């Protein structure tokens, strides 16, 4: 039974990292594209747009890091393995 739980934990860890990276990756690409478009339209507000972009990218990246933490806890501190 432990081998099944271990195998399921490895699969779940891979899915956790993979799925946690898809959403923020798409969001970061969209945010960067819109920021470049906004800077191209109004170059005088470049500093304000860049600051907001960097803050929002950090928040989006934190979601991926949370997925990594879940994956590492499943691999190394698995509560389901007896």
From Swiss-Prot:
Positions of the record's site feature: Reversibly protonated during proton transport: 61
Molecular functions per Gene Ontology: lipid binding; proton-transporting ATP synthase activity, rotational mechanism
Keyword Iron tagged: no
Keyword line: ATP synthesis, CF(0), Chloroplast, Hydrogen ion transport, Ion transport, Lipid-binding, Membrane, Plastid, Thylakoid, Transmembrane, Transmembrane helix, Transport
PROSITE patterns, sorted: ATPASE_C
Compartments (UniProt record): Plastid, Chloroplast thylakoid membrane
GO CC terms in record: chloroplast thylakoid membrane; proton-transporting ATP synthase complex; proton-transporting two-sector ATPase complex, proton-transporting domain
Family to which the UniProt record says this protein belongs: Belongs to the ATPase C chain family.
Subunit structure, as described in the record: F-type ATPases have 2 components, F(1) - the catalytic core - and F(0) - the membrane proton channel. F(1) has five subunits: alpha(3), beta(3), gamma(1), delta(1), epsilon(1). F(0) has four main subunits: a(1), b(1), b'(1) and c(10-14). The alpha and beta chains form an alternating ring which encloses part of the gamma chain. F(1) is attached to F(0) by a central stalk formed by the gamma and epsilon chains, while a peripheral stalk is formed by the delta, b and b' chains.
Protein name: ATP synthase subunit c, chloroplastic
Organism: Porphyra purpurea (Red seaweed)
Lineage: Eukaryota, Rhodophyta, Bangiophyceae, Bangiales, Bangiaceae
């Amino acid at each position: 039974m432990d081998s099944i739980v271990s195998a399921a934990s490895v699969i779940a860890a891979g899915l956790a990292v993979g799925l946690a990276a898809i959403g923020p990756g798409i969001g970061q690409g969209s945010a960067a594209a819109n920021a470049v478009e906004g800077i191209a339209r109004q170059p005088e507000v470049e500093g304000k747009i860049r600051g907001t972009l960097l803050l929002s990218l950090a928040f989006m990246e934190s979601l991926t890091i949370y997925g990594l933490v879940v994956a590492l806890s499943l691999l190394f501190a698995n509560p389901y393995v007896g």
